[in-house]
Each structure stands twice: as structure tokens, then as C-alpha cells.
Amino acid sequence: MQYSHHCEHLLERLNKQREAGFLCDCTVVIGEFQFKAHRNVLASFSEYFGAIYRSTSENNVFLDQSQVKADGFQKLLEFIYTGTLNLDSWNVKEIHQAADYLKVEEVVTKCKIKMEDFAFIASPSSTEISSITGNIELNQQACLLTLRDYNNREKSEVSTDSVQANPKPRALTKKSSQSKKKKKAFSSQKPGQSKAVQYPSDVLESASVELFLETSKLSSPVVEQIIQGNDSSELELTSVVENTFPTQDIVQTVTVKRKRRKSQSHCALKEHSMSNIASVKSPYELENAGEELDARFSKAKPMCNTCGKVFSEASSLRRHMRIHKGVKPYVCHLCGKAFTQCNQLKTHVRTHTGERPYKCELCDKGFAQKCQLVFHSRMHHGEEKPYKCDVCNLQFATSSNLKIHARKHSGEKPYVCDRCGQRFAQASTLTYHVRRHTGEKPYVCDTCGKAFAVSSSLITHSRKHTGEKPYICGICGKSFISSGELNKHFRSHTGERPFICELCGNSYTDIKNLKKHKTKVHSGTDKNPDCSVDDHAVSEQDSVQRSPLSETLDVKPSDMTLPLALPLGTEDHQMLLPVTDSQSPASDTLLRSTVNGYSEPQLIFLQQLY
């Protein structure tokens, strides 16, 4: 028994593995962009990759940027893994160039067909105007046929330098004695008017289109009668055309419009075509059709098919799609960390260089990111906090803070430890939790050498050396080095004892006092793993969240447990670096790894980045 969707399912699973970087055994490098993939998949679709992997076992394949553009290769890679190829006037050339270089013949064929279509739209001939008007109604098609034949007759008269005594359009085939008499009377000319005027062929071609557009205003009953074969109606239509548009007037009109079409892009010809035939563009307007198509398509804002987000530019959408696909082409040459966008890499590099380009005008503090400066101004200089909780009406300086706060109400904990299964509301909390499993302590005090797993712990510890105590009790005026100590002190005023022993019911103001109690009184009893020393930092953090003080006081940015590098969303401007007061050691000194100097490749990388 054969399952019809088995191949699609296999390709879908391979694509998900590629996006997650799972089992990818090769990396395609184009300039500063890197694309992970599977060798067997690339070799199956591309003769170029098939030839390479027959002769080498290297994991990295470097492609020439002049031959293969990163955007074109990304679209090609998506086609290989999904079978979907979206071609438009913006990307077809890059995709064709990449497919031709990598020998993906199926895509080359599709691109050639598409480019021919775009070339036809950009430069149509006047005789092919009917191909553009695919949805013209039947009566307008009949007008076009009749008038073209009429114009062909005029051309033949000009070429022979004589006027036919009884001219008649070829499309009007039926004959009657009455119509012959009327046609003869209508078309006969006086001797003084018998001289033919010879015009250039391109003017006559333009006159044909002019006739077609103008006669689209003719009454529908006349045209319907022509289609049904009514001889008198044919004559009536011909008479209307002759009387309304004499040959001399047509040529004069076309000549004038050809002279002024550059200065008057929206001429009367366009008005006629738009009002009568909505899908038709005149040859004058199609002269620069490529630019007009780009302008028309640019008015429709590009939208992400995955999440529905709308962007102002196609380039913004391409950058956004890297988030869904897991592509991180920007790599830090100092530590190897990869990022989705270039501005994220630049911000990250400031953790190595210590650069702080954004200065506060009120207190002269410097920040690595503009969003940090905005956050600082809202927290410390009275600027409005625009993000308000719908449940408790608390206001926040950033949307990310509001999002994290909302999880207290919803109970959502989306971040799960893959080692023990514990869940967390913040990604940073999960990061610090994992370090308890690994024992990693990357933040080292330059003064005493003590190491910490959390950056905020190092900042708080450094205040012991500097003597800084930025947190002040609003009741007694006593100052403290951290918000946790301030909250602990505040309980002495309120009498709150949030830490309760589950064995005997005693309560305490501090988690340390609870642990001392358990050690002395319940030393022979099995300890509750939730009250272990390993969870000290989390319990202390929970105490800050449960404290009534946190409802009235703003948490200092330096106590926000945020990781060094988080993906920057367009809505969630998360902080990449903790903000410290001017008296404390600079955060670049605290957070940087102790590096004596940069190697030459690293210096080149920094120069190219800026």
C-alpha cells in the first residue's frame, strides 16, 4: 500500500531539521551569510553540489558572491526543501543567476519563462496590445478587430497613393444592395480631396491604438448588432468612426501626445483607458512599464505568510523570515556567537569593546543601545511608561517587561529546562538555571576574582567594593546595595514574614533565616528540595516579586536579570546589557571576558563592522 503524502511528509521533516540545524552536515557560506543544509538533499537537486561532494568531504562550501547572491540562494534553498518557488520582478534575476551557477535546471527553466513574461510586459508592441487586455469584454474585442482592419485598409491606401472608390473594412463581410449604396455615398470623395497623405508607420500604429481606445466609448447596442451580423450596424459604426476621427485629426493628436508624453504622464489617453478598459495600459504608459510595475507592487506592503506581520519594505520581510527559519548569518568573530540581524551583531560587539554611543542628556550616562536609553529615561527621569497591565493597571517602561509581568497573572511558563523539566517565565531565568546544572560562572569580579552565574549578581557584588548603596528606604532613609536587601529591610516595618517552614509552620522575613532554622531544628529531617541552597537566587527573586514593595517601587535596571544577548524583535526591545549607575564600575569592565588584545583577523572584523 502506497501512502500518497509520504514524500511531502519526508520533505517537510527535512526542512524542519534544516531550520533547526538538526543533523545538518554542511554549511554554504556566501560572504558573511551562512546557510546550514544536508549534503544529500543539495546533491540531489544541484549538479554543482553533486560534483563537489563526490570529490571532497569538507563541511563548508564557499560560493562567490558575484555569481550567487545570498537572497537568491535562500529562495533556491527554500525551493529545494519545500518545492515552493515564488518569483517576482524583484528576485527572479538573482534566483536565475544562482540556479544557473549551481545547475538546478528546473529552476532555470521556470525563471526564463518568468523573465520572458516580465520582458513582454515591460515592452509590448502595439500589435500585441490585445494580448495585454486579457479580460476585455466581448463588445470591446469586436471594436478592436473592426478598427484594426479599418486601419489596415488606410495603410494600403497610403502605400498605393490612391483613394479607393468603395473602401470597406474586411471584418464587415456581409453585403446588401442598400449598404453598398450607402457605403459608396459615404466613402466617395471630391477631386480636391483625393490626394493621399503618407504618414510614418509608427504613427499609424499609434493611431490604431488611439482609435481603439476612443471607440470603446461607442454605444453597446451598435457593437452587439455588428456581432450578430447586421449590415446596417456595420455601416453605422464605420460612419461614426469616420466622422468622429478623421485621419488627419488622428495623426495630429498622436503626434502632439508623443511630443508631450514625457511631461504629461497622466494624459487623456490614460483617462480613456482607465475609465473604459480597467485592465488596459496604453503604449505610452507601458514605455517604462518595469518602473511602473515596481512602483505599483511597492504600494502593496509585504506580509509574512507565517505570522501575518506586515512590513513597509520587502527587505524588512526577508530579514524577518530569518527568525522563522532559524537563519543566523551574522557571526561575531570574537566569540563565535551568531545573530539574525546585523544590528544585533553590532550591539553584541559592544559587550567586547565597551562602546556606549547613546548618552543621556540629563545625567551623562552612556548606553550600548538606544532602547536602553529610552528605558533609563522612563525609569529615572519621569518620562511616561506607556505599557499598562490590563489586570492590575501597573505601568512599565518596555513592552517586554509588560509581557513578562503578564505571565504572573496567566501562570504561563514557556521556557523549559531540557535536563530537569523545570519551567520558567523568562528566558534569562532558564539560562541562569541551566548554569546551575553546568556549573558555569562567566562573570568574574576584577577586584577579588569571585565568579558568578548571573550578571546582576556581579553588579551587586561590585557595590561592596565601591560602597555604593542606590536603594533607599522610603520610611527610615536607610540605603542598601540591592533591591532584595531593601525589600528584606522593608519587612521589618511591615511585619511581613513570607518564608514559612513547611515542617513546623514558623515564618521568617529572610530565606537565610529559614535555612538556618531548618539546619538547627530540623537537621535530621529530609530537606525539601524546593528549599535547597541551589534555589537561593530564585527564592530571593520570588521574594522580590511577592513583596508589596515591588508594587510601589520601580525595579532598577541593574537588577533586571536579562541575558547578554537576546533576539531583538520589532516590538520587544529587550535589553542586551544591564544598566548601572555612574559610580559603579563600567558594565563593559564587569561583563567583558578578560582579553589582553585582539588578533589581526578580529581587528579586521571590527573595522569592517563599523
Curated annotation (Swiss-Prot):
Entry keywords, A to Z: DNA-binding, Metal-binding, Nucleus, Repeat, Transcription, Transcription regulation, Zinc, Zinc-finger
Compartments it resides in: Nucleus
Organism of this sequence: Mus musculus
GO cellular component, one term: nucleoplasm
BP GO annotations: cellular response to leukemia inhibitory factor
Pfam families attached to this UniProt entry: BTB, zf-C2H2, zf-C2H2_6
Record has NADP as a keyword: no
Entry similarity comment: Belongs to the krueppel C2H2-type zinc-finger protein family.
Domain of life according to the entry: Eukaryota
Positions annotated as zinc finger (C2H2-type): 302-324, 330-352, 358-381, 387-409, 415-437, 443-465, 471-493, 499-522
Signal peptide: none
Motif Nuclear localization signal mapped to chain: 174-190, 257-262
Sample GO molecular function, one term: zinc ion binding
Biased composition (Basic residues): 171-185
UniProt-listed InterPro entries: BTB/POZ_dom, Ikaros_C2H2-ZF, SKP1/BTB/POZ_sf, Znf_C2H2_sf, Znf_C2H2_type
Tissue note: Mainly expressed in the neuromuscular system. Located in and around synaptic myonuclei in adult muscle. Expression is dysregulated after nerve injury. Also found in the cerebellum, testis, heart, brain and liver.
Name of protein: Myoneurin
Main localization of the protein described in the UniProt heading: nucleus
Record carries keyword Metal-binding: yes
PANTHER family noted in UniProt: KLUMPFUSS, ISOFORM B-RELATED, ZINC FINGER PROTEIN
Domain (BTB) ranges: 24-89
Gene3D superfamilies the UniProt entry points to: Classic Zinc Finger (3.30.160.60), Potassium Channel Kv1.1, Chain A (3.30.710.10)
Residue segments, region Disordered: 156-199, 519-548
